[in-house]
Amino acid sequence: MYGRNFPFFNSLGGFYPRGNGFPLDAPSLDPRKPSGTGYTSKVRVRDKYRIVGFISSGTYGRVYKAIGKNGEKREFAIKKFKPDKEGEIIQYTGLSQSAIREMSLCSELDHPNVVQLEEIILEDKCIFMVFEYTEHDLLQIIHHHTQPQRHAIPAPMVRSILFQLLNGLLYLHTNWVLHRDLKPANILVTSSGAIRVGDLGLARLFYKPLNSLFSGDKVVVTIWYRAPELLMGSRHYTPAVDLWAVGCIFAELLSLRPIFKGEEAKMDSKKTVPFQRNQMMKIIEIMGLPTKEIWPGITSMPEFSQLQSLAMSRAPHFNRSSNLENWYQSCLKNGGYSANSSAGTPGADGFDLLSRLLEYDPTKRITAREALEHPYFKNGGPISANCFEGFEGKYPHRRVTQDDNDIRSGSLPGTKRSGLPDDSLMGRASKRIKE
């Protein structure tokens, strides 16, 4: 069924490559097990890596492309964390919860469809995570196909991407890890077509939590990929939130645009999480209005009264039943998907899987394990471990620039003055730092 050298299924831990030395049972997140990725002390980034340029930045800090020194010629992505701040003033109060979670989880995780952490390097007032370098991500690939004179992402490529993504997700869920921020930008793709689930900054363990997951992080998952139970204010949630996001990604790979592209309502000054009215409207327009018949638990959701109000005010514009199949058929037609086209087609099996991923009721939503056994993957020939196999086009390399404050200031790791761009300001706490 699967192509040669493709991962095989193991009931304990998911799918693993054949003959690569993985044990038959899943690597577990056992605190008694010595971490495969240790914390490196008394080593500076510039001693081991040559910085090529700047990739991106975010709330966490900055990411750089690097090449190994001392005979190690592989490429790496180095994530440099910002210090925590009190207001606008650098206080060096420690690392964020997100950074600590990402470091602790990535140090233990080991799977071919999850991004590989090489090492963690601690420097004075600065910390770096060194990852394998991936040349692409799904957002970049989707954007490439939206350009004029370009066509739909071939159906076999979509199938391989989705299989590998679910494969990595099964491994995470089997080891009690929720990702909680799956979206195209966080799904990395190597130059050889291997999928890596990346950016575990919002990930967390969900085995017997002391408090509800909501109490720790009130807002999770980027709005367009946020599951309806989260939008409805659920105080506790399950791995099903990740599967909804996979459904959104599947739809986006086919249509080349987000299926539920709503506008996010921001939290107020009291950090109260608002009802995401616009996003819920976008979902209802395609999926129909959720009722207690199709989702019995919805009536007990904190935002149920808000949903009722929304339904009453927008009643003439809402479908009472799902419009997903019409959306899907229109998507296939507009994308040129058919059995006779070069793009191929995901067919009826593709729609069935999509509808089970985008199930309103999280208790009925398909799991990663069930999805991997779905006819969409069982039928239709072998699945390639290289999602680019058979694709004649070329995707552009990831953009790497010199346009970054660290590079201009000489504080980039690998230059003479390594560390944060503001490390020279220690002792001048009144100085405010521009972002």
From Swiss-Prot:
Residues 49-377 form the Protein kinase domain. The active site is at D181 (proton acceptor). GO terms for cellular component: CKM complex; mediator complex. Residues 398-435 are annotated as: Disordered. Its cofactor is Mg(2+). Component of the srb8-11 complex. The srb8-11 complex is a regulatory module of the Mediator complex which is itself involved in regulation of basal and activated RNA polymerase II-dependent transcription. The srb8-11 complex may be involved in the transcriptional repression of a subset of genes regulated by Mediator. It may inhibit the association of the Mediator complex with RNA polymerase II to form the holoenzyme complex. The srb8-11 complex phosphorylates the C-terminal domain (CTD) of the largest subunit of RNA polymerase II. Signal peptide: none annotated. One of its GO terms (biological process) is positive regulation of transcription by RNA polymerase II. SUPFAM superfamilies: Protein kinase-like (PK-like). It comes from the Eukaryota. PROSITE patterns: PROTEIN_KINASE_DOM, PROTEIN_KINASE_ST. Component of the srb8-11 complex, a regulatory module of the Mediator complex. This is Serine/threonine-protein kinase ssn3. GO terms for molecular function: ATP binding; cyclin-dependent protein serine/threonine kinase activity; metal ion binding; protein serine kinase activity; RNA polymerase II CTD heptapeptide repeat kinase activity. It is found in: Nucleus. Its EC number is 2.7.11.22, 2.7.11.23. ATP binds at I55, S56, S57, G58, T59, Y60, G61, R62, V63, K79. Its main location: nucleus. PANTHER family: CELL DIVISION PROTEIN KINASE (PTHR24056), CYCLIN-DEPENDENT KINASE 8-RELATED (PTHR24056:SF495). Residues 398-407 have a biased composition (Basic and acidic residues). Keywords: Activator, ATP-binding, Kinase, Magnesium, Metal-binding, Nucleotide-binding, Nucleus, Repressor, Serine/threonine-protein kinase, Transcription, Transcription regulation, Transferase. InterPro entries: CDK (IPR050108), Kinase-like_dom_sf (IPR011009), Prot_kinase_dom (IPR000719), Ser/Thr_kinase_AS (IPR008271). It catalyses: L-seryl-[protein] + ATP = O-phospho-L-seryl-[protein] + ADP + H(+); L-threonyl-[protein] + ATP = O-phospho-L-threonyl-[protein] + ADP + H(+); [DNA-directed RNA polymerase] + ATP = phospho-[DNA-directed RNA polymerase] + ADP + H(+). Belongs to the protein kinase superfamily. CMGC Ser/Thr protein kinase family. CDC2/CDKX subfamily.
